[in-house]
Amino acid sequence: MASPAMHPVLSAAVPRHIAIIMDGNGRWAQRRRRPRVIGHRAGARAVNRTIDFCLEKGVSALTLFAFSSENWGRPQDEVDALMKLFLHALDREVEELQRRGVQVRFIGDRSRFAAPLRDRMAGAERSTAANSRLVLSIAASYGGRQDIASAARALAEDVAAGRLQPEQIDEALLSSRVALADLPAPDLFIRTGGDTRISNFLLWQLAYTELWFTETLWPEFDAGVLQQALDDYAGRERRFGLTSAQIADKATESSSA
């Protein structure tokens, strides 16, 4: 069963949901002969610029890939610095996000984070839960395969408990168990830093998402670059497996209804 988010449409000027891999912090710092953590701090400022842009344009959901399940394998000093930066950012930014009407969520496996950080994450979610201007989802210790496996495990547990029959499992049911299930699927995916892959990010959710890649390093990402992405997106035709003629016919039917 197709979800409403998968009806063929011409791209709107402003996507409802933008997902971003924020790549290039380390290279930005290295080019300046600075420690990598300096790049991550500069990247935090780019996050604020992106939130500002989304609020101004009326984007309803923004999902940021902050820390992958594979990133735990990075050098320990970098992981430790990232955890401190993450903790300080939560302490510093949540009150401002609350004031601006931003709802904060986290997706991913929290069990590997230290207790103080888990507590801050839960506190940020509680304090902003009623906000509705923008849903900011932060993927932390997240992996797309892990996400799908967790959803499959939950369905298997329901079958084993007799709450569900195997023949009832379809794409829509699995979609309801993965992360971000209550949000529209991302309309636009952006990756900064020059690499052209999705790196285990939202594998299920990105099935029909428009992909946009830029050489811009994340700390240099600003409203101008984001507007370029939106301009490109607005010129695309989202067919969801159909033909352009079918989309034109559906548009005619909708306008005459």
Curated annotation (Swiss-Prot):
GO terms for cellular component: cytosol. It holds the Pfam family Prenyltransf. The keyword Calcium does not apply. InterPro entries: UPP_synth-like, UPP_synth-like_CS, UPP_synth-like_sf. Mg(2+) binds at residues 23, 210. CDD domains: Cis_IPPS (cd00475). Transmembrane segments: none annotated. Signal peptide: none annotated. It is an enzyme of class 2 (transferase). Binds 2 magnesium ions per subunit. The keyword Magnesium applies. Catalyzes the sequential condensation of isopentenyl diphosphate (IPP) with (2E,6E)-farnesyl diphosphate (E,E-FPP) to yield (2Z,6Z,10Z,14Z,18Z,22Z,26Z,30Z,34E,38E)-undecaprenyl diphosphate (di-trans,octa-cis-UPP). UPP is the precursor of glycosyl carrier lipid in the biosynthesis of bacterial cell wall polysaccharide components such as peptidoglycan and lipopolysaccharide. PANTHER family: DEHYDRODOLICHYL DIPHOSPHATE SYNTHASE 2, DEHYDRODOLICHYL DIPHOSPHATE SYNTHASE FAMILY MEMBER. Belongs to the UPP synthase family. HAMAP family: ISPT (MF_01139). This is Ditrans,polycis-undecaprenyl-diphosphate synthase ((2E,6E)-farnesyl-diphosphate specific). It comes from Xanthomonas axonopodis pv. citri (strain 306). The gene is uppS.
